[in-house]
Swiss-Prot record:
GO aspect biological process, one term: viral DNA genome replication
Source taxonomy: Viruses, Monodnaviria, Shotokuvirae, Cossaviricota, Quintoviricetes
Residues of the SF3 helicase domain: 373-528
Cofactor stoichiometry and binding remark: The endonuclease active site can probably bind other divalent cations.
The enzyme's E.C. designation: 3.1.21.-, 3.6.4.12
Protein name, per record: Initiator protein NS1
Annotated domain remarks: In the N-terminus, the endonuclease region is involved in binding to the origin of replication. In the middle, there are the ATPase and helicase activities. The C-terminus probably contains a transactivation domain.
Subunit and interaction comment: Homooligomer; when bound to DNA.
Limits of the PV NS1-Nuc domain: 21-259
Binding-site list for a divalent metal cation: 119, 127, 129
Entry's localization field: Host nucleus
Organism per entry: Parvovirus LuIII
């Protein structure tokens, strides 16, 4: 197809139809019948009453513009003005019905694909074809749509009827329109149940092969069948002339024709064995797609996010088992197709990354309290959550109470959503809740005891089978584990016997994060949006959640004795560039002097103010009285007055120092 041989409108319409060639839509037909009420004849052209609503007037003007722009200038149409006006009114009423049904379903018109064409048939007279569909449409909703459109269509026809009718006659006309179904839906009859079911059609094929091939009506009254005008959601066919419509149909047919046609022979026995999906199966599949799309992983989430489908299944025979099996398929789909890191990352609001500061998050502040490189720690955790840690498949937060272990683990588990919890109280089936999950959470882990081998297999990301209560054994696929504890879980005791042979294998399976800094009582919880933003920040800045990226950034794979403090982070909390940083003026804090020398109080000088944020490793830990490491204390301890005096003597000569000393005021 040569690009210069056809107009942009023709090529644009052809490509638009090709993009939507396989989109399934409903096919409706709007019509009216000749009615006689108490001697009053009401025909197809008896609905020319002036429309009062502004929206209907706007739709009518749009139909008039479409008619004028699509007329061929080479010949003049002889359709009379009354026929044109009737078609314009019908077009506005049909679109008004569609928009009202969309508003009841809270569907935006921009999310819907539709096509409307008014035609005249030799036997049927005037009728209007409507194709409509979108992502929120399902085959099971077809009959509901027909009923709603039938109600709105009958109501608006009565409103537009130009024949003088009494209130009782108007009600009767509306009843006739609803009972005779002046809005019909394309259906098919099931061979076994003998019931009618909605038949969806392919949007692009239906428009190109059927509607665009028809001739335009140019006489009044119409002698042959054809179309008056058409419009669509993409504004592609509205202004096309008859010849351009035929050209689009031909180009579409040529482009969509398969190069080779495979012929298959189906025997009568195979046809008999052919299985057609029931309405119930279609409904379950549609519901399952919505649950996976919205990441529903629990009955409570289902009740809150999809109450209609939950009630529909609950009302069916065996509804509880149906709910349980549907939810199990949903969690299995998420566990097999997504990692915990993927589920966290997709919740991130990337538009806020511009003003996002990693150092100001509560998680990184907890790590910074220990003098660690919080970027390195978060990068290692993300690698494990993305199943890239290899045998080291478990993130272990351990240390004293109130150091932030559980709040970090809770934030990660909440961001993942599809989480299974280890139940230590269930001695026989502790992993009953851990199948088909993206993350396993072990809270307050203790002595593994006789379950140590099963624990080691799960913590290393192996595929094992576990026993379930009241069921057979079930397989657990490689799943990341996040664990918190106050105890030394590397020491395994079975009965009264200590088993040291398990210590090193357990360490080889753990990402060791030892938290020792007690948090203040007003520290607060980690925000639910914090970890999605952390993951998005890491990806944006080149810290991919793979072990290859981790080794390229930090040199080696993390082990049990990993030094999280090296290399030093370039921008610390409350440093210049952070939102909590102090003003960049010369203060003792900017010179790494954390405390006021006690000698200044004896000299009656104004003491230095204590900084609001202590330097890591210099101030005693609250509640415990423990100090930081010896290296940090030596590097950042406060200078004494004698040391300052020695520095001053070194800066000035002895004569200058003596003359200046004689001029000092008497402080006593």
């Amino acid at each position: 197809m040569a690009g210069n041989a056809y107009s942009d409108e023709v090529l644009g319409t052809t490509n638009w139809l090709k993009d939507k060639s396989n989109q399934e839509v409903f096919s409706f037909v709007f019509k009216n019948e000749d009615v006689q009420l108490n001697g009053k004849n009401i025909g197809w052209n008896s609905y020319r009453k002036e429309l009062q609503e502004e929206e209907l007037k706007s739709l009518q003007r749009g139909a008039e513009t479409t008619w004028d722009q699509s007329e061929d200038m080479e010949w003049e149409s002889s359709v009379d003005e009354l026929t044109k006006k009737q078609v314009f009114i019908f077009d506005s009423l049909v679109k008004k019905c569609l928009f009202e049904v969309l508003s009841t379903k809270n569907i935006a018109p921009s999310d819907v694909t539709w096509f409307v064409q008014h035609e005249w048939g030799k036997d049927q007279g005037w009728h209007c074809h409507v194709l409509i569909g979108g992502k929120n449409f399902s085959q099971a909703q077809g009959k509901w749509w027909r009923r709603q459109l039938n109600v709105y269509w009958s109501r608006w026809l009565v409103t537009a009827c130009s024949v003088q009718l009494s209130p009782a006659e108007r009600i009767k006309l509306r009843e006739i329109a609803e009972d005779q179904e002046w809005v019909t839906l394309l259906t098919y009859k099931h061979k076994q149940t003998k019931k009618d079911y909605t038949k969806c059609v392919c949007f692009g094929n239906m428009v190109a092969y059927y509607f665009l091939t028809k001739k335009k009506i140019c006489t009044s009254p119409p002698r042959d069948g054809g179309y008056f005008l058409s419009s669509d959601s993409g504004w592609k066919t509205n202004f096309l002339k008859e010849g351009e419509r035929h050209l689009v149909s031909k180009l579409y047919t040529d482009d969509m024709r398969p190069e080779t046609v495979e012929t298959t022979v189906t025997t009568a026995q195979e046809t008999k064995r052919g299985r057609i999906q029931t309405k119930k199966e279609v409904s379950i599949k549609t519901t399952l797609k919505e649950l996976v799309h919205k990441r529903v992983t629990s009955p409570e989430d289902w009740m809150m996010m999809q109450p209609d489908s939950y009630i529909e299944m609950m009302a069916q025979p065996g509804g509880e088992n149906l709910l349980k099996n549907t939810l199990e398929i949903c969690t299995l789909t998420l566990a097999r197709t997504k990692t915990a890191f993927d589920l966290i990352l997709e919740k991130a609001e990337t538009s806020k990354l511009t003003n996002f500061l990693l150092a100001d998050t509560r998680t990184c502040r907890i790590f910074a309290f220990h003098g660690w490189n919080y970027i390195k720690v978060c990068h290692a955790i993300c690698c494990v959550l993305n199943r890239q840690g290899g045998k080291r498949n478990t993130v272990l937060f351990h240390g004293p109470a109130s150091t932030g272990k559980s709040i970090i683990a809770q934030a990660i588990a909440q961001a993942v959503g599809n989480v299974g919890c280890y139940n230590a109280a269930n001695v026989n089936f502790p992993f009953n809740d851990c199948t088909n999950k993206n993350l396993i959470w072990v809270e307050e882990a203790g002595n593994f005891g006789q379950q140590v081998n099963q624990f080691k297999a799960i913590c290393s990301g192996q595929t094992i089978r576990i026993d379930q209560k009241g069921k057979g054994s079930k397989q657990i696929e490689p799943t990341p584990v996040i664990m918190t504890t106050n105890e030394n879980i590397t020491v395994v005791k079975i009965g009264c016997e200590e088993r040291p042979e398990h210590t090193q294998p357990i360490r080889d399976r753990m990402l060791n994060i030892h938290l020792t800094h007690t948090l203040p009582g007003d520290f607060g919880l980690v925000d639910k949006n914090e970890w999605p933003m952390i993951c998005a920040w890491l990806v944006k800045n080149g810290y991919q959640s793979t072990m290859a990226s981790y080794c390229a950034k930090w040199g080696k794979v993390p082990d049990w004795t990993e030094n999280w403090a090296e290399p030093k982070v370039t921008t610390e909390i409350n440093s210049v560039g952070s939102t909590n940083s102090p003003s960049p003026k010369s203060t003792p804090l900017s010179q790494n002097y954390a405390l006021t020398p006690s000698d200044l109080e004896d000299l009656a000088l104004e003491p230095w103010s204590t900084p609001s944020t202590p330097v890591v490793g210099t101030v005693k830990t609250p509640n415990t009285g423990e100090t930081g490491s010896t290296a940090c204390q030596e590097a950042q301890r406060s200078p004494t007055w004698s040391e300052i005096e020695e520095d001053l003597r070194a800066c000035f000569s002895s004569e200058h120092w003596k003359s200046d000393s004689e001029q000092l005021p008497n402080l006593d």
